[in-house]
Swiss-Prot record:
Keyword field contains DNA-binding: yes
Protein name, UniProt field: Replication restart protein DnaT
Gene Ontology biological process: DNA replication, synthesis of primer
Pfam family, one: DnaT
Protein function: Involved in the restart of stalled replication forks, which reloads the replicative helicase on sites other than the origin of replication. Can function in multiple replication restart pathways. Displaces ssDNA from a PriB-ssDNA complex. Probably forms a spiral filament on ssDNA.
Disulfide links within the chain: none
């Protein structure tokens, strides 16, 4: 913060006319001190915007649009697609996917998260998709195994070892 401070003022001087001091300062950051120790900083909204404006950061640094897209958080949209090496990345995250994402699975995922309106990084969206696929595919496998609705379970008449029998 010290690098960004344009002016150091004592607390007594600041308390006499704070509005005039703030309006006069061009750098928008003032250090207020008492007994040669900083008590607090006055940071104007313009300075905060400069500090935290991601667009300005990307203008200053020469980052490509593709890199910018991956770095920023964004809400889910209909044109979103996972990376080409999505299956390999999922394996690194401990999620074993045997087949590629179908267009129906992707459409279902996108429509759900589009409605939510939450913001995540591209990598986070991919992780969410991988977990979603893992859950839905495992549920589909379980449902396929239980397809025979006419099956009536019959208990066996064996008494396990260690239990009292008849």
């Amino acid at each position: 913060m010290k690098i960004l401070v344009s002016k150091k003022i004592t607390l007594d001087l600041f308390c006499k006319n704070p509005i005039q001091i703030i309006e006069k300062e061009k750098n928008e950051i003032i250090s207020i001190s008492k007994n040669k120790k900083t008590v607090f900083y006055v940071i104007q909204p313009k300075a905060l915007k400069k500090l935290f404006d991601i667009k300005e950061y990307f203008v200053k640094s020469k980052i490509t649009k593709k890199e910018k897209k991956i770095i920023e958080k964004f809400p889910m949209h209909t044109n979103w697609i996972p990376d080409k090496d999505f299956i390999q990345k999922a394996a690194l995250w401990g999620i074993s996917l045997n087949e590629e994402v179908s267009k129906y699975e992707l459409a279902s995922f996108i429509s759900y998260w589009e409605a939510e309106g939450l913001f995540f990084h591209h990598i986070q969206w991919q992780q969410k998709l991988a977990r979603s696929l893992e859950r839905s595919r495992s549920m589909n496998n379980a449902i396929q195994q239980k397809k025979d609705i006419t099956y009536i379970p019959v208990p066996d008449q064996k008494t396990p070892d260690g239990f009292r029998g008849k």
